[in-house]
Amino acid sequence: MSLKKQLINEQGIRTDGRGIDDLRPIKITLGYLAHANGSVLYEQGKNKILAAVFGPSEVHPKHAELPDRAILRVRYRMAPFSTEERKSPAPTRREIELSMVIRNALESVVLTELFPRTAIDIFIEVLQADAGTRVAGVTAAALALADAGIPMKGITAGCAVGKVDGKIVCDLNDIEDKEGEADMPIVYIPTLGKISLLQMDGLMTQEEFKQALSKAINSAMKVYQLQVNALKTKYIKVER
Ligand code: CDP
């Protein structure tokens, strides 16, 4: 019989030293790449995610273009060296599905109708993964889109919450994601007060779910504040 590993100690401290509501440290480096229209290196704890935006540009193949709006193309990939066990470089079903999930989360904010017959390409490259990469990917993509000057109704801010050792905790790391009882990634759009991605693995009661949702929105608001600060620092120059 294997004993379940304790992930939160009696003092309420998690394996990486955080309290149950604490997020991992976040670092945002805008304009990280020279050849993209917009880019960011987004670090959240051990997660290191590069997002690059190209466009709006002509659509190839031509028949894929839409007469009334731009198409968003999202490619989420994990580098072979991003996980503890080397991952195959071939795209997995998970990566293809997450590319679609992320595109859906972004489609509700990008003003695609301003750029008919064009494509906006968003690349999300996970260089190092430590759980929550889909929501960190959406967070990073919004920053890269803003960096590219693409108009949006709001900025998507993501964070996962979950149930670990019977408690609802914010921003799960890899071991909490794998060994915890539930994992719930969400993406929130503060300017619209709307959620554009919500998934859940595992089991929670209705009460726990309500608590998780409220903690997820609070966490996303903290992420949003950091996104806004990073964009203001780069783009709002104080006149002297
Ligand atoms: O990353 P996210 O939580 O959005 O997606 P997941 O499918 O729930 O994966 C959770 C974590 O498992 C990832 O962030 C990686 O740390 C890890 N993982 C892995 O080690 N190898 C894979 N092929 C896929 C995920």
What are the residue ranges of the model-derived segments?
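Polyanion-binding surfaces on beta-sheet-dominated domains and ring/shell assemblies
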Residues: 1-240
